[in-house]
C-alpha cells in the first residue's frame, strides 16, 4: 500500500512539475511574442500615458510597502522600461483588436466562468458571485482578449520549438 502511495505521489509531483514548466514556457513565449511585435513596430506613445502609468505603479508599490519610506525616483527609474513597454503594448493591442476585428463574446465569458467553476467545484458560489461584479468580469474579459490577440499574432509568427532538459536549466541558473 505505501509503495503505491509513494509511486502515486512521485507521479503526482512529476505531473505538477511538468505542468508548471509548460505554463512558465507558455507565459515566456507569449511575452516574447508581444515583445517581438513591440520591437518590430516600435509604436510611438504619449509621454503623459507613461507618466500616468508610473504614477499608478508607484502608488501600488507604496501600498505594498506598508507605509515604509520609499524613494519615488528610484521606483520610477526601475519601472520606466516596464511602463514604456506596457504603454506600447497597450497601443498595439488596441490596433490589433480594431484591425483583426477581435472580440470577446458573452459566450466566451460564460464558457470561461464555467471552466473555472468546473476546476473549482467547491467554490462555485464564490466564483459566480465574484464575476457578477463588473470590474472582475472586465478583468476576465481583458484576460480572454489577451489570449485572442496572442492567438491572432501566432498566425504571423515563425516559431522554433526547442526542448530544454531540466539539468540544462539548473546549470544556467548556477552561472549567475
At which residue positions do the language-model features occur?
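Extended, charged alpha-helical "arm"/coiled-coil substrate-binding scaffolds
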Residues: 1-176
Amino acid at each position: 500500500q505505501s509503495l503505491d502511495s509513494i509511486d502515486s505521489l512521485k507521479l503526482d509531483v512529476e505531473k505538477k512539475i511538468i505542468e508548471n514548466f509548460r505554463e512558465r514556457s507558455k507565459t515566456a513565449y507569449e511575452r516574447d511574442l508581444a515583445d517581438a511585435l513591440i520591437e518590430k513596430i516600435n509604436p510611438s506613445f504619449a509621454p503623459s500615458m507613461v507618466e500616468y502609468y508610473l504614477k499608478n505603479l508607484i502608488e501600488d508599490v507604496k501600498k505594498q510597502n506598508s507605509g515604509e519610506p520609499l524613494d519615488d525616483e528610484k521606483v520610477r527609474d526601475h519601472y520606466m522600461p516596464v511602463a514604456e513597454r506596457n504603454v506600447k503594448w497597450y497601443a498595439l493591442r488596441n490596433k490589433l483588436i480594431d484591425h483583426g476585428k477581435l472580440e470577446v463574446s458573452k459566450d466566451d465569458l460564460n464558457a470561461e466562468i464555467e471552466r473555472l467553476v468546473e476546476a473549482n467545484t467547491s467554490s462555485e458560489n464564490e466564483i459566480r458571485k465574484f464575476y457578477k461584479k463588473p470590474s472582475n468580469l472586465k478583468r476576465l474579459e481583458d484576460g480572454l482578449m489577451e489570449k485572442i490577440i496572442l492567438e491572432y499574432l501566432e498566425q504571423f509568427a515563425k516559431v522554433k520549438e526547442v526542448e530544454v532538459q531540466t539539468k540544462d536549466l539548473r546549470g544556467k541558473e548556477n552561472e549567475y
